[in-house]
């Protein structure tokens, strides 16, 4: 969708793990290549979702937005791919910020592993934070790859 500008080193980015029920959000800094989970938003009602995203954008003033794009393990699209791309277009249209995508295959499974290794908590607690933890991994993955190519 967009190329990363050369002067964006040290910039703040918001990452999104899109789902039809919940959307995980993380914040990260490109200078360190690290991200932290922020919160999980309910996807419905739509007006409340966009108000919450607007609030986060006003608070963090990101240079861009990164959305995880899910595919099957063989690279083909899955049922969530089209709604995710629609969400990307909506973000771009509403906020006039560059929107980048990165492969998010297995990020929720990876976040589960990180959660249990570090916190040794109950599965109920994981369910509350899994989407924002997946958003954190999406953003960290994006920081670690060659970002010169557009979405």
From Swiss-Prot:
User: Which keywords does this Swiss-Prot/TrEMBL entry list?
Assistant: Cytoplasm, Hydrolase, Nuclease, Ribosome biogenesis
The UniProt entry, under InterPro entries, shows:
RNaseH-like_sf, YqgF, YqgF/RNaseH-like_dom, YqgF/RNaseH-like_dom_sf
Enzyme class, UniProt record, top EC level: hydrolase
Q: What is its EC number?
A: 3.1.-.-
Q: Which SMART domains does this entry report, sorted A to Z? A: YqgFc
Q: Name one GO molecular function term.
A: nuclease activity
For whether the record's keyword set contains Cytoplasm, the answer is yes
Please give the positions of the paired cysteines in each disulfide bond. none
- GO biological process terms on file: rRNA 5'-end processing
* Cellular-component GO terms for this entry: cytosol
The cellular location(s) given in this protein's UniProt record come to: Cytoplasm
Q: Sorted alphabetically, which Pfam families does this protein's record hold?
A: RuvX (PF03652)
Outline what the protein does: Could be a nuclease involved in processing of the 5'-end of pre-16S rRNA.
Q: Which family does it belong to?
A: Belongs to the YqgF nuclease family.
Family annotation (HAMAP family): Nuclease_YqgF
- PANTHER family listed in its UniProt record: POLYNUCLEOTIDYL TRANSFERASE, RIBONUCLEASE H-LIKE SUPERFAMILY PROTEIN (PTHR33317:SF4)
The name this protein goes by in its record: Putative pre-16S rRNA nuclease
Q: What is the lineage of its organism?
A: Bacteria, Pseudomonadati, Pseudomonadota, Gammaproteobacteria, Methylococcales
